[in-house]
Regions:
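Charged interaction patches that mediate protein-protein contacts
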Residues: 1, 268-270
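N-terminal Sec-pathway targeting helices
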Residues: 2-17
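Active-site histidine-anchored catalytic micro-motif
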Residues: 20-255, 259, 269
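Short beta-strand micro-motifs in enzyme catalytic cores
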Residues: 264-266
Length: 271
């Protein structure tokens, strides 16, 4: 009789554990559709600050949860004549050097042009490889902080704003819990005084939610204004406004004016 009672208690405990785990899983994957946005650089001088920002997103903004999907927007560094936004053609493991992460091709189902010529994602045995360093810089942190999230890459021309309008209508109605990251570095090749002035104008423009295309190009000093314009347009549709978290540069990090070797970084999140 005593053994039977102990067995019953054990089963009750196991049942409660299963119910709690099911509840956690349900809460994790059945939240209402939500869009979140962040601007994170891929210039990795003082990479600890990038980790610090990811940690802020994970533990303060998401409060320990994580998005279901991540759209990672990055400039097309090596094919500057490309005028269209592209994504990956098939879901596959993508390698950068010796590091690998799976990317999803689900955005190509929305008739977003995919990289058929292998300019960005080159066939490599049964997988793909890339020379775009933003892949690994963000992958290793997404693996660490948002390991469950499915990643959708968007590779954008840097200055062809006309590429944005058609993709906006395809993305805006997605019923996902999404974090949209624009992987962008800001002012380059200027002394720190000029860099700071340009960054202040960029920050003001992003905070003001400016969507005038000509003004955006004139006022944003970054390696991919189109990446920022796409993110800004989506954020505006979702009534999210930019907040500055950090701003630094090669000069402030190294505590000396780097002049032509200067690159600035701006970390922003939207609420």
């Amino acid at each position: 009789m005593k053994r039977s009672k102990t067995t019953n208690i054990t089963w009750i405990i196991l049942l409660w554990i299963i119910l709690i785990l099911c509840l956690i899983f349900w809460l994790k994957w059945n939240k209402k559709s939500e869009w979140d946005f962040a601007i994170i650089p891929h210039f990795m001088l003082d990479s600890e600050k990038v980790d610090k920002f990811y940690d802020f997103l994970k533990n303060e903004y998401y409060n320990g949860w994580e998005p279901e999907k991540i759209i990672l927007i990055s400039p097309n560094h090596f094919h500057t004549q490309t005028k269209e936004i592209q994504t990956i053609c098939k879901s596959a493991n993508v390698s950068y050097n010796s590091n690998t992460r799976k990317l999803s091709s689900e955005l190509s189902d929305l008739w977003i042009k995919c990289d058929k010529n292998g300019e960005i994602f080159e066939s490599w045995w049964d997988n793909l490889k890339t020379n775009e360093h933003w892949i690994w810089e963000h992958f290793q942190r997404i693996n660490k902080y948002f390991s469950w999230a499915i990643i959708f890459p968007i590779i954008s021309p840097c200055f062809q704003l006309s590429a944005v309008e058609s993709i906006l209508t395809k993305l805006k109605n997605l019923n996902w819990n999404i974090l949209v990251i624009a992987s962008v570095d800001f002012a380059h090749y200027q002394n720190e005084q000029q860099t700071l002035q340009h960054d202040q104008k960029s920050i003001e423009t992003l905070k003001s939610m400016t969507l005038n295309q000509s003004e955006f190009i004139d006022w944003i000093d970054a390696d991919c204004p189109v990446c920022l314009y796409l993110l800004q347009s989506l954020a505006s549709q979702k009534w999210k406004k930019a907040e500055l978290r950090y701003r630094d540069s090669s000069s402030t990090i190294l505590n000396q004016d780097m002049w032509a070797e200067n690159t600035s970084r701006i970390f922003m999140w939207y609420k």
